[in-house]
Structure formats: structure tokens, C-alpha cells
């Protein structure tokens, strides 16, 4: 029983491998645009004559021929060779700055140097390599032939060939940024007027402003009448144990934090305490009753014992 299962599994594996080989053959024939030339038969001897053994048929595909090609000289065009390609490269593109971009069958992109022909995997690596050729203006426009030192200058120049509407100055130059149009220089302009905005007249209502003195400002009642302390004045021993005393009601505290919370009562403000709200304490999953965030809230008059 075990041998039969093993043979059946091996047969299924062989059938699957044969199917995959046929799929690979079809892909290669479509890719290379060539016909399968034929089938080659051969015999395998296992101690017997070749005539007694049944020949096995296999498929053979002719390798693609290598043909050199030259891409189109026009910019932003993709050309493909008629037959095969050099080193598996089947696409070529020439950008506006003259950089040759090649793409192989596996989808990998290569950037070719314009001066020596070396290829690189990344554009930044190619730009760093082109500096060794000591070219002052390596970035050349593909439409008008003007060269620039930096790539950003070429990108700004390439916008002039597009249909983007810009800002035109009276001198005839067109700018694609209003700030550059406003601050660009003219040969006949004086130095002090370069970049200066046009002068405009602003009408100001010159109303006489009466100065306000300190006597005209209203004074609070506690400045003139004073406060009567709600608690009796502390003796020296109490002041030593609670040195932080309120200047309005003479109530003392042992630390500055307690005095700071007490000052809210004189400001007319009331600090929100979520533990004093039955609605907030009844909610679950908000973190107010969580032991980790319990001490984040002060223990004020609405203190509620924790539930954990």
C-alpha cells in the first residue's frame, strides 16, 4: 500500500514538472518571437542495447541571437530591438537632460553615463559619477540645447517649454513664481530699488489720543478696604510647620502645591475633578478608575476612593 502511494505521488510530481516545463517553453517562445525548431530524441541505456529501449522525447529551444541596437535620438522615446537585446535589455529611454535609461526583462532600471557609457542602478550614483568628468554644465536641455550647472536650473528651464502660464514682466521675461518676478533685477534699475515694492498711500485717521494715567484706572475693593482674615493669625510654631500662607485669607499650607490649589478659590475658578462626577466615575474604560492613572488627578474636595 505504501509503495503504491509513493509511486502515485511521484507520478503526480513528474506530471507537474512536465507541465511547468511546457509553460516555460511557451513563455520563452513568445518572448523571443521564435518558433520551436523541433524535437530531439535520444535513448538511455541501462545495460541493454539502445534499440530495445523506448526513446524519450524532449523539447529544445534555440537561444536568442544577440544583436546590437542603437536607441532613438529623440527625447522621451522608447525603442525596442527587432530580435533579441544586449544583455537582456529590451527598453531604452532618453530623457530631456540626455540621460539614457535602460530597462531589462526583469524590470531592473539602469542609468547610463552620457560621457563614458558606464551604467548604474541609481540616479544619485550616476550624478555622483558624472562629477569626475569635470564638466562645468553637465545638464543639457533636450529641446533647445542650453546647458546648466545644476539639475534644479534645468527643471526650471524645462517649464518654459511646457504650457504652464507664468508671470510676465514689462522687460519681457517670464517667471513661474510671483516672488521671482517681483525681485528679479533689471540692468537699468538702481541698486536701492531692486526688490522694493511699489509705494502706496494709506489714509490714517489722525485722531487725538488721550493718554490714560494710573489714577484713571479702577481699583479693586481689596486694595482700599482690605480683607478680614477668615482664620486667626498663626503663631510662630504654626508658621514654621506651614510656611505657605495665603495673602488674602491667611490660610496656611505645608507645601506650595496646596497653596497653588487654594488660589483657585480667589480667582473665581474651579478645577474640574472627574472623581466628583457620578457620570464620569460610572463610565468604564476611560482611565479615570485605572490604577495607573489614578494619581494623575488631585485629591480635592470631590475625592472618591479608588475601585481597584
Curated annotation (Swiss-Prot):
The N-terminal part (1-106) mediates the nuclear localization, while the fourth zinc finger is required for the localization to M-lines and dense bodies. GO terms for biological process: locomotion; locomotory behavior; muscle organ development; myofibril assembly; post-embryonic body morphogenesis; regulation of transcription by RNA polymerase II. PROSITE patterns: ZINC_FINGER_C2H2_1 (PS00028), ZINC_FINGER_C2H2_2 (PS50157). It comes from the Eukaryota. SMART domains: ZnF_C2H2. It comes from Caenorhabditis briggsae. Pfam families: zf-C2H2, zf-C2H2_4. One of its GO terms (molecular function) is RNA polymerase II transcription regulatory region sequence-specific DNA binding. This is Zinc finger protein unc-98. A zinc finger (C2H2-type) spans 111-133, 139-161, 166-186, 244-266. The keyword Lipid metabolism does not apply. The lineage of its organism: Eukaryota, Metazoa, Ecdysozoa, Nematoda, Chromadorea. One of its GO terms (cellular component) is nucleus. It is found in: Nucleus; Cytoplasm. PANTHER family: ZINC FINGER PROTEIN 200. The gene is unc-98.
